Amino acid sequence: MGFFRVFSHTRTVARSGRLLVALGAISLSLLVCVPHAFGQGCIVARSNGEQGGPDSEGGYLASGDWEFGIGYRHQFSYIHFVGATEQNYRTQLGTQVENKINLENFYATYQISARFSVTADIPLLTASRHTNNSSIIYTSAGIGDSSVLAQGWIWDPREKTSGNIQLGLGLLLPTGKDNVMNTISSNGVTSTVPVDYSIQPGQGGLGIPWQWSAFKNWRTNQFYFNGSYTMMTKDLGARRSNTNNPITLTQFNAVTDQYLMEGGVAHPISRIRGLTVLFGPRMEGVPARNLLPVGDNLGFRRPGFAVSVEPGIQYTRNGNVLSITIARAIYRDRTRSVPDVLTGGHGDAAFANWVWLANYTFRVHHLDTSHADQGHAAAAGKAD
């Protein structure tokens, strides 16, 4: 039950021109599973991302500058789907699975030069899983899979203040546990069992995240398009139960790729300095097959995706940026996994109706910034 997991490592970052649309999914995404939190509930894709380009007061980061941030993502998934068809009978009979996920991301970016930067991200997950007609509640908490990414602007920010594209490549490190166990009591019998993979803090494998961020200023608006895809270098993770599962294709959890795409427009409110409204579509999910040929795409996974509309606001002041968005799902699809296809089945997954996202960043400027970089930072903060 349940869809993807939740990406925790992915942050879509773009700093430039006039507006910094810094919010996003957290990313973990971008969709996004701490290894699996992106999508919705059980699917596992976790992300707190950023949207847009640089803000009107900070502009591009100057060489030697630091930016620190905290991202937050909350979702409550309980709406079951098989394919794109909602399974209404689950809530009517009270058999729905309810996943509650709270994901925080702590990250820091260091600007190496005018074009290049590095970012380190550490996620923290707190989650619970409960079948409505059962008294047993499964829980997990801990550090998720951390990441380190290098990012670079295609064009020199000192020359391109009205639009640019940033590309990033990094490593997702298996710092989160993928075998969290709970001790439960059922029918007078006490046992210790692994929790469902949708609330495991880690995936148990090394990943290669790559991302892009693009923005273009037009009049007083900024249009943005951000995305992230994480390729996993491992096929199978932890065993799903303490005993051998007779269904050999799914006795282990799959270590899944995950992705996030989002775009939209940011419009400043002229009467309130530093306030910007955001709106655009968002898509995040987990594919049925991984990109890298490291296995047979077996193991247990809940592939699928969710498409949402995401309105939000952002407030910028003195290099501090606070963003809040709410993603409302308008289309959800639990696609078939490779074991589903081989056995003729089609599993279900629980999705969220709403995903709540918040992000706060602040900057620490390098005191010994050169005259050239000072001019660069000042120019980037001006409207075109």
Residue ranges and their predicted role:
Residues 1-49, 365-384:
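Cleavable N-terminal export/targeting peptides
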Residues 64, 100-104, 139-146, 163, ...:
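Residues that define the transmembrane beta-barrel architecture of outer-membrane proteins
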Residues 40-43, 56-65, 77-79, 115, ...:
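Short loop/turn motifs that connect adjacent beta-strands in outer-membrane beta-barrel proteins
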Residues 126-254:
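Outer-membrane pore/translocation modules
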Residues 56-59, 70-72, 106-110, 120, ...:
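Residues on the lipid-exposed face of transmembrane beta-strands in outer-membrane beta-barrel proteins
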Residues 81-92, 235-384:
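Outer membrane beta-barrel transmembrane domains
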